[in-house]
């Protein structure tokens, strides 16, 4: 196991999209002052405590989980829906929905039953619907139902836009207008776009030993 935290400072997403997480309230003082204690707790429990500058905790978590699941079953615990795109054989996700009172355990089958398409299309879904929590726009007017319907048929944005002429007029215009945003978001919302070999060789910017997923 491991505890993964955001490092201080901006990430590559802030450089790519200036309004990323704009308007989000800062961490409450009561929580911020306890962060060093959480790091110490991880060390006392024998858990690697991991953070890396320039990326988010999700990036570290995703890269670590994908590397580890090649050798052993992995369970990711998170409140962030973005990490559902990690789902694959040997990797499940527990998503906290209401603080620590309600959880959903996802595998590929549970995800597909809920969304109607496979997990490897989830970042395309996020590109279409956007993410209000991160102040990231989607394709205006497509919405949740429209995105699900498209991704039941198409494997991703490339296929959707290659087949643009076949979409009904109103939907086609929405997709055309939103294409610049849609084409930004898949990589922008990808939580594991890290080269694992470089990731491990450079170690991680954390104050403790971070030999994760050995």
PLM regions and their residue ranges:
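Noncatalytic, basic helical substrate-engagement surface that gates or grips nucleic-acid strands
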Residues: 1-77, 81-107
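Non-catalytic nucleic-acid-binding/docking modules located in mid-to-C-terminal regions
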Residues: 2, 45-47, 66, 70, ...
